Amino acid sequence: MSRVGKMPIAVPKGVDVAINADQISVKGSLGTLVRPVNRLVSVKNEDGKLSFAPADESAAANAMSGTMRALVANMVNGVSKGFERKLTLVGVGFRAQAQGAKLNLQVGFSHPVVKDMPAGIKVECPTQTEIVIKGSDRQVVGQIAAEVRAIRPPEPYKGKGIRYAEEKVSLKETKKK
């Protein structure tokens, strides 16, 4: 059995977990998340702890029990604490501005780039060169951060572009005569 799948998830106070036959829903202060439960995994809620077990002895069921446990742990963390991704703009004249559910970027194109945020995602710009994307669904937060970074990824010679705050960009040397 998967080592990750063996560990139970402690459900914090203020988080409600409902398990149906084919889906699990987690409700907390930051919203509600719903995920289908794989038929190879059985989920039990006992004394405020969620436990996962493979439905049969196959290798796929063992692997899926660990995967489901990790996904549900992210759901529990998301509705209680939330997730955030920070991006940094590097370049002369590069600016970001949050306007409600939209992110307005000026990153060296002849026109400003406007990115709409989906429901449940908040975007903040503490400074003109910083972007903070927050939400309860870890996958959606990471996806939106990747889409924003893809607008102008860091180039390898000067490092200009949009990068994750913790990202290290390795720079190439210029051509020598």
Swiss-Prot record:
<dbReference type="InterPro" id="IPR020040">
    <property type="entry name" value="Ribosomal_uL6_a/b-dom"/>
</dbReference>
<keyword id="KW-0687">Ribonucleoprotein</keyword>
<keyword id="KW-0689">Ribosomal protein</keyword>
<keyword id="KW-0694">RNA-binding</keyword>
<dbReference type="GO" id="GO:0002181">
    <property type="term" value="P:cytoplasmic translation"/>
</dbReference>
<dbReference type="GO" id="GO:0003735">
    <property type="term" value="F:structural constituent of ribosome"/>
</dbReference>
<dbReference type="GO" id="GO:0022625">
    <property type="term" value="C:cytosolic large ribosomal subunit"/>
</dbReference>
<dbReference type="GO" id="GO:0019843">
    <property type="term" value="F:rRNA binding"/>
</dbReference>
<dbReference type="InterPro" id="IPR002358">
    <property type="entry name" value="Ribosomal_uL6_CS"/>
</dbReference>
<dbReference type="Pfam" id="PF00347">
    <property type="entry name" value="Ribosomal_L6"/>
</dbReference>
<comment type="subunit">
    <text>Part of the 50S ribosomal subunit.</text>
</comment>
<keyword id="KW-0699">rRNA-binding</keyword>
<comment type="similarity">
    <text>Belongs to the universal ribosomal protein uL6 family.</text>
</comment>
<dbReference type="InterPro" id="IPR019906">
    <property type="entry name" value="Ribosomal_uL6_bac-type"/>
</dbReference>
<protein>
    <recommendedName>
        <fullName>Large ribosomal subunit protein uL6</fullName>
    </recommendedName>
</protein>
<dbReference type="InterPro" id="IPR000702">
    <property type="entry name" value="Ribosomal_uL6-like"/>
</dbReference>
<comment type="function">
    <text>This protein binds to the 23S rRNA, and is important in its secondary structure. It is located near the subunit interface in the base of the L7/L12 stalk, and near the tRNA binding site of the peptidyltransferase center.</text>
</comment>
<dbReference type="InterPro" id="IPR036789">
    <property type="entry name" value="Ribosomal_uL6-like_a/b-dom_sf"/>
</dbReference>
